């Protein structure tokens, strides 16, 4: 599997923020978000045999593995990796951009899906796979990064149209106004969490955390 980095840190995004995890960041992404904070994962990387990668995971003390990228689901051995980690008794949080089907990846309650819905500011051309919504479960959630009012309007409209029974995280782009987002959500009754990237609050905006 083509890997950018493997590191230990605190999960900084979404409803599982604060949990210590082993992060396995794959290389290559099938889209190019304008404000992506891991553009270094688009190129390079190191090919690590699946058996070696699983050995690293097995030795890690964390009970959670964050499988991220890049876009991890483009990796040929993605499903085999996830199945093997689940067989170890560990939880896997898959961070995916929603353009690839998750149908085969929701076979266990130990798997948790963090699925992006890309807003206008991302300036991506590859579309979100709407069929993925029907595979999301209670422990899964949709994450929308919000940079400006146009993104916020988009996010609220998406929740209005498709949000029944689904959980959402509205995540302010790093450096944007979280209070402005919160003020729009309070009192609406939406099933939305407004959460910043806490790993950047703890460590700063640097790779490997």
Curated annotation (Swiss-Prot):
Homodimer. HAMAP family: QueE. Residues 16-205 form the Radical SAM core domain. Keywords: 4Fe-4S, Iron, Iron-sulfur, Lyase, Magnesium, Metal-binding, S-adenosyl-L-methionine. It holds the Pfam family Radical_SAM. Pathway: Purine metabolism; 7-cyano-7-deazaguanine biosynthesis. It is an enzyme of class 4 (lyase). Belongs to the radical SAM superfamily. 7-carboxy-7-deazaguanine synthase family. The keyword 4Fe-4S applies. [4Fe-4S] cluster binds at residues 29, 33, 36. InterPro entries: 7-CO-7-deazaguanine_synth-like, Aldolase_TIM, rSAM. S-adenosyl-L-methionine binds at residue 70. Catalyzes the complex heterocyclic radical-mediated conversion of 6-carboxy-5,6,7,8-tetrahydropterin (CPH4) to 7-carboxy-7-deazaguanine (CDG), a step common to the biosynthetic pathways of all 7-deazapurine-containing compounds. This is 7-carboxy-7-deazaguanine synthase. Substrate binds at residues 10-12, 25, 68. One of its GO terms (molecular function) is 4 iron, 4 sulfur cluster binding. It catalyses: 6-carboxy-5,6,7,8-tetrahydropterin + H(+) = 7-carboxy-7-deazaguanine + NH4(+). Its EC number is 4.3.99.3. The gene is queE. It comes from Thermoplasma acidophilum (strain ATCC 25905 / DSM 1728 / JCM 9062 / NBRC 15155 / AMRC-C165). Mg(2+) binds at residue 38.
